[in-house]
């Protein structure tokens, strides 16, 4: 793909050059641990700390009160060439405690020992109760200016650039859990705007398990490991989770999303993000509009398949964290468009019969198109995980003028919870003064003292009104940029503990989601429910879950029941008949391949000229080539030698988005079961390394593009991959193979990772299928090209495409 056809790569290179002024990683392969290559021997010549890697940056060097300091980031890092204690005193030894003789007792006066051990004993802070496992990056948000008619927030203005820090996370797992578990993902963004910090604290799923925050401890207690054994870790496939969600049916919609491919994303870079709740925007004249926030990834929405996710969790539990950091280091900067669905701010706060205050409901994009308002680009990795990713503190109440909350009862509870949790996790009320949390707007509050106070406040009158400090700080009005809550009218009523009747429908929207899936996506949902419920011990919970599924779709219920070996419950009340929302499907479009990882399998006898050409072409296209060989080192000699990044012992298919073979590699000398279990019990005389056959067969089974030339077809045949199967590419040259593989990568997977034949298609009455129609979904140009996966029936006309021009609701 040429640069002219790859605008994302051009943007990334421009941003890298202008924003960071950096060069890419060596040989285009990310993952270098430090900014300099270490010598074999221990360095002994004193020198100062190395600079960070070119892809890394830290928090802006503003003061605890938001004032620019002019200091460089190196000024707030460690300095000097010699080891010191915490007070700056140089040390001559840090390997031996101070003792009464070489074999004597350690002396109490050893202040260095006490300081070093005491600090180590207190290095850990309480992990987040939820979203403990996370990864983050710095970036910039550029407003399009298109939201000016409905929102006065300055950062949404045309071409306004705002620094951001984004943290992605799982929900249930502890800090050390695996990345690729089936779970909801957090997508939290901190905007350092000129008017203060704005936090958009969202998820990759647009609905939530509960409608009221008072139930949050219940759903999390149910999803977390069982309290007696502390197992299973980072899993929902256990009795307590399914006990709760089958008894508490408002969780049905979110549970269905979790069981879909959305629960096992391929990458943080390939996730949608959602604000979940309905917010209220305010324009310059005081008019209001209700909105839902969406993040739309420029790389599309893609997932792993379940077996792949499980293998990845064992082979590389840091897969998503590594993927994000490596992509940024390689210059393939992830991008998302921020968009809003807009609704009139009517007294009922409903739209097309959907209660906008219910966080378990969506508004289909066909009814309210997502209007883009800005572009997010992540262009730098953190310099220190603890100081930035671990200590960042988000809060739904961090708002700026122009953005207000609604009466969503879950959102209202979150407004309390986020501040409360930081008091324990970050050790007091001054967490906003931590460098990563510092606003870039001047702070003149009257909050004083407390644990970890780092601001040195002046004056004698931290109260209002005062005269001793000249009356400062003064109150601002709306004209001076003050945050003024919308004077929304509160309907008269009695104090009650109940939900509105509109919250009672727990099954129409889950059915809408199910009907919106293609057949292969439905197969994955069936498999997920069958797996998760199959892990439950109590049959009563499985039977109860089937009763819930029967209220979503009869076919779904019957398939899961068959997998569990249980009878499907009899049909109950008639099922809802919502119009499907094609925008909910992940299947059918093509996307840029930026940051995709391609494994090139070769050895010294392979077509090394083709390998070199392939590497260069992949790098030019914004992808990452990794050479896989029987052993490490280099292939070939001289200046043209090709560096090996992975061996048959260290590689596994889950790392690659595509695999190409540049010949028939020799069997590795370590292809013995005693050395590497992946080799199995294959005979030493076997022509092809069994670990390579495993890699290729897994890639084929997971629907990945596979290519071969120069005899590599023999390996494909030995691995059981039909040479004429969809997604299997053979050719006479590396260039010929790469062109087809790149095209396949644009669709992510062949058949969405389901190459083996599916069951016969469902009846037309069950899946709304029929001949001769077209699949549509919302895209920037309004339509999506035809997709052969699931045609619409004439009796079920797809919704009209959204308008091309942005239209805002009438106030």
What are these regions (language model features)?
Residues 717-718, 790, 795-797, 808:
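Short, positively charged low-complexity motifs
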Residues 781-782, 792, 805:
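Intrinsic structural disorder/low-complexity segments
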Residues 575-609, 615-626, 630-782, 809:
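Active-site-adjacent pocket-lining segments in enzyme domains
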Residues 798-802:
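Short linear motifs in low-complexity or flexible loops
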Residues 343-347, 790, 803:
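Short, solvent-exposed beta-strand-terminating loops
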Residues 2-605, 612-620, 624, 629-648, ...:
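Active-site-adjacent core segments of small-molecule enzymes
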């Amino acid at each position: 793909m040429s640069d002219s056809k790859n605008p994302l790569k051009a943007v990334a290179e421009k941003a890298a050059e202008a924003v960071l002024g950096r060069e890419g990683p060596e040989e285009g392969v990310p993952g270098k641990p430090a900014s300099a290559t270490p010598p074999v021997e221990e360095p002994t010549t004193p020198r100062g700390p190395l600079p960070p890697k070119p892809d890394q940056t830290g928090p802006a060097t503003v003061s605890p009160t938001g004032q620019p300091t002019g200091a460089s980031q190196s000024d707030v890092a460690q300095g000097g060439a010699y080891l010191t204690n915490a007070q700056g005193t140089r040390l001559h030894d840090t390997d031996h405690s101070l003792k009464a003789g070489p074999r004597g007792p350690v002396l109490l006066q050893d202040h260095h020992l006490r300081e070093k051990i005491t600090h180590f004993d207190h290095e850990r802070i309480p992990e987040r109760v939820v979203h403990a496992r996370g990864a983050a990056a710095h970036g910039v948000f550029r407003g399009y200016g298109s939201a000016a008619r409905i929102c006065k927030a300055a950062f949404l203005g045309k071409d306004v650039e705002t620094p951001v820090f984004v943290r992605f996370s799982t929900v249930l797992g502890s800090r050390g859990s695996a990345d690729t578990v089936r779970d909801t993902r957090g997508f939290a963004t901190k905007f350092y705007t000129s008017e203060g910090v704005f936090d958009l604290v969202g998820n990759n799923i647009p609905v939530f398990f509960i409608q009221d925050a008072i139930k949050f401890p219940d759903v999390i207690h149910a999803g977390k490991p069982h309290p007696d054994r502390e197992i299973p870790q980072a899993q929902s496939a256990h009795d307590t989770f399914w006990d709760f969600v089958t008894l508490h049916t408002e969780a049905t919609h979110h549970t269905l999303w979790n069981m879909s491919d959305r629960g096992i994303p391929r990458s943080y870079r390939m996730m949608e993000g959602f604000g979940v709740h309905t917010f209220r925007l305010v324009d310059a004249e005081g008019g209001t509009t209700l909105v839902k926030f969406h993040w739309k990834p420029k790389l599309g929405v893609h997932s792993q398949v379940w077996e792949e996710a499980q293998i990845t969790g064992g082979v590389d539990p840091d897969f998503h964290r590594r993927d994000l950091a490596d992509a940024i280091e390689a210059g393939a900067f992830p991008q998302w468009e921020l968009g809003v669905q807009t609704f009139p701010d009517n007294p009922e706060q409903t739209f097309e019969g959907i209660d906008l205050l219910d966080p378990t409901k969506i508004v289909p994009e066909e009814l309210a198109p997502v209007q883009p308002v800005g572009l997010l680009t992540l262009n730098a990795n953190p310099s220190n995980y603890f100081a930035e990713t671990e200590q960042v503190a988000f809060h739904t109440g961090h708002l700026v003028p122009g953005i207000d909350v609604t009466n969503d009862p879950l959102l209202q509870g979150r407004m309390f919870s986020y501040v409360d949790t930081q008091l324990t996790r970050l050790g007091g009320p001054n967490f906003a003064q931590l460098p990563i949390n510092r606003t870039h707007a001047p702070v003149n509050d009257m909050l004083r003292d407390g644990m970890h106070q780092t601001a040195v406040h002046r004056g004698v009158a931290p109260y209002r009104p005062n005269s001793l400090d000249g009356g400062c700080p003064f109150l601002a009005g709306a004209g001076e940029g003050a945050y003024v809550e919308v004077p929304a009218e509160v309907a008269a009523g009695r104090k009650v503990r109940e939900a509105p009747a509109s919250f009672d429908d727990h099954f129409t929207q889950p059915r809408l989601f199910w009907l919106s899936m293609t057949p292969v996506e439905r197969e994955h949902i069936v498999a997920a429910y069958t797996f998760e419920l199959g892990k439950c011990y109590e049959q009563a919970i499985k039977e109860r879950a089937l009763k819930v599924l029967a209220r979503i779709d009869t076919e779904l219920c019957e398939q899961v029941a068959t997998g569990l070996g249980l009878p499907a419950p009899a049909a109950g009340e008639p099922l809802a008949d919502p119009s499907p929302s094609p925008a909910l499907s992940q299947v059918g479009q093509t996307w840029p391949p930026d940051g995709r990882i391609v494994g090139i399998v070769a050895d010294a006898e392979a077509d090394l000229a083709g390998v070199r050409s392939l590497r260069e072409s992949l790098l030019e296209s914004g992808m990452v080539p990794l050479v896989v060989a029987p052993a490490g080192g280099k292939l070939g000699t001289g200046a043209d030698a090709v560096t090996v990044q992975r061996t048959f012992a260290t590689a596994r298919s889950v790392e690659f988005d595509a695999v190409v073979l540049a010949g028939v590699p020799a069997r590795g000398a370590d292809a013995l079961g005693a050395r590497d279990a992946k080799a199995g019990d294959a005979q030493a005389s076997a022509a092809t390394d069994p670990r390579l056959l495993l890699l290729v067969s897994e890639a084929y089974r997971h629907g990945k593009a596979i290519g071969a030339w120069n005899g590599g077809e023999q390996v494909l045949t030995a691995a059981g991959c039909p040479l004429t199967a969809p997604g299997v590419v053979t050719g006479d040259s590396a260039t010929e193979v790469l062109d087809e593989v790149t095209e396949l990568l644009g669709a992510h997977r062949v058949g969405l990772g389901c190459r083996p034949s599916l069951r016969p298609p469902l009846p037309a009455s069950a899946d709304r299928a029929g001949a001769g129609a077209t699949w549509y979904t919302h895209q920037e140009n309004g339509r999506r090209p035809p997709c052969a996966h699931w045609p619409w029936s004439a009796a079920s006309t797809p919704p009209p495409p959204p308008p091309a021009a942005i239209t805002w609701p009438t106030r």
